[in-house]
């Protein structure tokens, strides 16, 4: 089967909660269309600069950082870093010529998607949480589609552009078969006759 070559920029990161859904999206796009060319854009010095290349994708870093909630002189640098990052993002977009730009949240996605929107590139946002992040709320105003995992997200985003997709899951996370379940029960000393519930903490607070 012949596929049209697609060019996709995926931007966001800072924590695994943004990075791993982004990698899941990239993997799904590749499985649907092997000709898809994907470029990641993240923040220099953050987790995505290691995780994305390890997964086999190219990534470009921007000199951008998040807004500190406490009083800090670093916040004075933020407007200049943002403008510089938007300029670099525009250059990347002109060179790569994407068909679409996808933002997965986090401050790293803001310059890239803002640049894409200003250049007329279609944009899509993926929001993993039940409470939308600041970057996604700002970018949603001009996004073509907003993919969400929970009901009630119209309190953050325009209802007519919301698509309920659930959260992207990596292909390597597979349903446990009987043998795997038995091994887990033995390892944790659990009673196999009872239902088991796994609770996993999220983001940096899970420590």
Regions found by a protein language model. Give the residues of each.
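Nucleotide-sugar donor-binding and catalytic loop/hinge architecture
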Residues: 1-6, 52, 178-199
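Short amphipathic alpha-helix
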Residues: 18-29
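An aromatic- and histidine-rich active-site surface loop
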Residues: 46-50, 98-119
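Active-site-proximal region of nucleotide-activated glycan assembly enzymes
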Residues: 58, 117-185, 190
């Amino acid at each position: 089967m012949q596929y049209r070559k697609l060019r996709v920029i995926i931007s966001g990161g800072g924590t695994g909660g943004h990075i791993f859904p982004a990698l899941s999206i990239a993997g799904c796009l590749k499985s649907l269309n092997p000709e898809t060319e994907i470029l990641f854009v993240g923040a220099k010095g953050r987790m995505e600069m290691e995780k994305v290349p390890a997964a086999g994708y190219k990534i470009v870093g921007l000199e951008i950082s998040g807004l500190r909630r406490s009083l800090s002189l670093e916040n004075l640098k933020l407007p200049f870093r943002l403008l510089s990052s938007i300029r670099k993002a525009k250059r990347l977009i002109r060179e790569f010529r994407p068909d679409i730009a996808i933002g997965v949240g986090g401050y790293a996605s803001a310059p890239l998607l803002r640049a894409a929107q200003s250049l007329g590139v279609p944009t899509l946002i993926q929001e993993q949480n039940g409470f939308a992040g600041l970057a996604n709320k700002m970018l949603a105003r001009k996004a073509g589609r907003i993919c969400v995992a929970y009901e009630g997200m119209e309190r953050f985003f325009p209802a007519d552009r919301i698509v309920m997709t659930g959260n992207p899951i990596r292909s390597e996370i597979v349903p446990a078969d009987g043998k795997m379940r038995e091994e887990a029960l033995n390892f944790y000393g659990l009673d196999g006759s009872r239902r088991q519930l796994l609770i996993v903490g999220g983001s940096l607070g899970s420590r």
